[in-house]
Amino acid sequence: MRLKHFKTFLFITMAIIVIGTGCANKKKKKDEYNKPAIFWYQGILREILFANLETADNYYSSLQSEHINSPLVPEAMLALGQAHMKKKEYVLASFYFDEYIKRFGTKDNVDYLTFLKLQSHYYAFKNHSKDQEFISNSIVSLGEFIEKYPNSRYRPYVEYMQIKFILGQNELNRAIANVYKKRHKPEGVKRYLERIDETLEKETKPKPSHMPWYVLIFDW
């Protein structure tokens, strides 16, 4: 009987705490507007520190809408871009870097910012290893960087990423050719094998990508 009363008491206590916390949060959210830029910026950094990136993104939206010309806006963009990349949220990382380039890019920083954007694509590569369009677009963007910023300190890193993407494209083309081979379509086999960069293959001698056995069973 005592146990039953204790459970009832515990349930009521927890309910009061939940309701009280909810009310406090609502009041807190209600009061969070028309704040100085530093308030939102510090909130962004705090939420990044605790890996609450969704809240950090919301704080950025408030900073952006209430203080569009604040010098803290570009700082927040960079911080959020790097935080999302660290958390492997590469699409969001690329978004922040791209927005920074469009709004605050200068001849002194645009190569670095473009490099960060390309780096987010590179890290996202394993999630898009069978996305022909993603790979092709990334190779083009990497080539444009090399052409546009031949003397950039980041060029060697971009060239490395470009090689990795081309090798990935080679592997994808070989896999697609194999599909056509299984379907007895020699024209398709020929078309995709011709797209392989044989020179790069000979120079780098890449190892096939590791693929778990449970993926291999259903692959292609």
Curated annotation (Swiss-Prot):
A lipid is attached at residue 23 (S-diacylglycerol cysteine). It is a lipid-anchor. It comes from the Bacteria. Residues 1-22 form the signal peptide. The keyword Signal applies. A lipid is attached at residue 23 (N-palmitoyl cysteine). Keywords: Cell outer membrane, Lipoprotein, Membrane, Palmitate, Signal. HAMAP family: OM_assembly_BamD. Part of the outer membrane protein assembly complex, which is involved in assembly and insertion of beta-barrel proteins into the outer membrane. NCBIfam families: OM_YfiO. This is Outer membrane protein assembly factor BamD.
